[in-house]
Amino acid sequence: MAFQCLQTAIAQTSVTQDPGATPMTAAPTLRFSDFYLFPVGPLGLESSPALRQAAGKQVLLTGYMVQQENGSKPGQFFFTPRPVQMSEHADGDADDLPPATVLVKLAPDQAAWCIPHTRGLIQLQGTLSVGRQEAPDGRVTWVQLQLNPEATRGMNVFEFAGYLHTLQHSH
C-alpha cells in the first residue's frame, strides 16, 4: 500500500488535534453516542432522531481514525468513537468496527489521495449522510461524512519524509 501512496498525491488531514479548539465555522457537534437508540430493541439497532436530523447538514465529529493494516483506500477512511486497528489479512470481513463507524470521504477531486493514519483524538467537520451505501468491494456503511475540500491538503516534503519514516518503523 505504501508504494501505491507514492504513486498518488498524499493527503495530510488538517484536523484539529485539540478537541477544545474552536473550528473555523460553527457546526453543531454530533456525538457517536447519539447515533443509535438504546437499549437495542428486538429489531436491532435503530438510528436516533438526532442522527436522522443531522443528515445532509454540516456536523462536527470527534473520534479516532481507524488504523488499517493495509492502509485506508485512497480518498476515504473509517472514523470511530474509540481507537481501532483493523487486521484485514487475518480477520477478513470479520472486523472489530463498532456500529457507530463513519466512512469519511475526501472531496471528489481528492479521491486519489492516500491518507496517512493520524493517531489520537481528532475532530472532523463535513456533511453527514445517513443510509445504506455499498462499496464496490461489498462493504456496507450506514453513516458517511463528506469532508469539505479545504479540510485536507497535500504534504510538504518534510511531512512526506516523516510519513515514510513512520512506515519503516511501524509494527
Question: Which residue ranges define each predicted feature?
Answer:
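OB-fold and OB-like single-stranded nucleic-acid-recognition modules
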Residues: 6-171
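N-terminal export leaders
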Residues: 1-3
